[in-house]
Structure formats: structure tokens, C-alpha cells
Curated annotation (Swiss-Prot):
Annotated InterPro entries: Plasmid_replication_init_RepA
Transmembrane segments: none
Region (Disordered): 38-58
Keyword Cell membrane: no
Name recorded for this polypeptide: Replication initiation protein
NCBIfam families in the record: RepA_IncFII_LM (NF040977)
Entry keyword annotation includes ATP-binding: no
Keywords attached to this entry: DNA replication, Plasmid
Amino acid sequence: MAERYISQRHWSQLPPEEQIRVWEDYEAGRATTFLVEPERKRTKRRRGEHSTKPKCENPTWYRPARYKALSGQLGHAYNRLVKKDPVTGEQSLRMHMSRHPFYVQKRTFAGRKYAFRPEKQRLLDAVWPVLVSFSDAGTHTVGMSVSRLAKEISPKDSKGKVIPELEVTVSRLSRLLAEQVRFGVLGMSEETMWDRETRQRLPRYVWITPAGWQMLGVDMVKLHEQQQKRLRESEIRQQLIREGVLREDEDISVHAARKRWYLQRSQDALKHRRAKAAARKRANLLKKLPADQQIYEMSQHILKRMPPDEAYWCTPERLQQLAIRELYQLELTLAAPPPH
């Protein structure tokens, strides 16, 4: 077992019974100091031999050239974070958010004692350009889930796929964002629902709070005006008006728009997961059949989903082509023999 040592305490911090014992030892000459060493507590905790170094020590992310430039105060915030060399066109950080005095002022409030470690500083500097770049002008919600943000920041190969050895893990980014929520610069969606089908929780999203925008140095008055204008033009408000929840002259609040947006994202995630689970279940059933039987079963399935007018004019050759294409999408190799 490993031993855990606790710093010494002054005798005045001890309970009354122990204070009497300390003075008795001091008068008897058995104690020569007023600092009392507490009993050593034994624990089973051990420092492992594994490396705690993150996979991606120096993540970076800049807005690609093919992206449309951000407008208004969002563009101003991004330009304060990132600068572009006019000669070479290379982008680099103009402002390191990890060194902002706000993190020093609110350190105790967030439950920290010390400054950020270098690897966390670099991750925090890389996260903020992504948050600003994908933030909605109306709700200030980042349009990516935490797992999608981790994938976006992670280094990629020439084909655009994440390199597993250098990826930014979801757990690492999730801990960082949760700490930013404690600092008050980010907000996070409420506790997500549990999806029994996939045994996973629905995605979580974050948004930038007014404290976060103030750190970025934007004009809060202009930001609020642009936010209200975008909310009045938003699809969420038009949908509520069509449903009769809002009148034409009523405005939607930021909280209501954000809650409605998150509900839509949750429903989209559920639909996608249900469709994916149904496709996988169908693929597992078709794997047991011969190739010609797979095509026949898939053809019947496609025919049932077709509109009546389209199904009437669909030829057997066209239906077979659709079935083969659907089978390839289900990752079924028709050339392989069926399992026995």
C-alpha cells in the first residue's frame, strides 16, 4: 500500500482533547514544536506507470478558405482570435484565450488552484476559433455536438479522416467544456435523455454566454441588435407562428429559441439512430440469405416504400438496380458466399 502524507497543522486547529494532549507532551519534553503531524493514512491508490500525455498535444484549427467569411460581431470576434499573413496567407493565433485575465480572476470560483497546464492551454486556444466559427448568430449555440467538435479539431490525413493516434478524444474535450461552463463563459444543454435503443445519450451542445463574448472583445450592444434581428428572421420563429404559438408581432426569446433548437436536434438524432438501427437489423437478416434472395427481399422492401405512381412505372430492371445499390449501402458483399 502507498502512504499518503498530509501537511502539518498548528495545535490550535486540533480538537480540545488533542490540544490538551499536545500541551501535556510539550510540558513533559516529549514534543519540541507546536506543529502537529497528523496520523499517516494508508490508501490503496497508486500512481500507474501509464503515460498521461494526450494523443494530440498541439491541436490547431483555422477556418478553411472555402468557408464564407463571418459577418457582424461574429466575424469581429474571429478576427480578434485569428490573424492571416497577407503575403503567405497562413493563419495563426492573434489572441491566446488561455492567457486571458478572466481565467485568473475566476479561478477559485471555478474550483481551480493553479493555472492551466500547457497541453490544456493549447487545446483551449484551438477550441475558441471553432466555437465562434460555428456559433449561430441568433441563439449563439454552437451547431456541433461535443463529439463532432472533437472530430473537427483532431488532425486528419490526406483523405480527410481523423488520425486515431493523434485524435482529440471526446472525453478530454468534454472535461474542458465542462470546466468552461464552471467559469461561466459557456453554457451547456440540460441533462440529455437516455436512448435505450443505442444505449447512448443524445448529443450535448454548448453556447457562448455574454461573459464569453465580453472576453472576445465584441461590442455587446451591436451583438445584441444582430442577435435580435436574426431571431426575428429565424426559421424557428416562423415555425412557431405557423403553429399558432406566436403572433406575427411577437418576438421569440433567446432561451425559447435555444430550447426549441435543441429539441429539433434531439429529434433528428433519434430519427437518424432509428434508421441506422433498422438498416443494421435488416442487413443482419439479409446476410443469412443467398445473393439472389438478398436482391429479391430488398426489391420487395423498396417497392413497399415507393409512392404508388412511381411503383406503377418502375420496371423490374430498375427495381433490381435500386436493390443492389441499397445492398451496397448496407455493406453487404454480394460476391461472398452466404454463411453456413
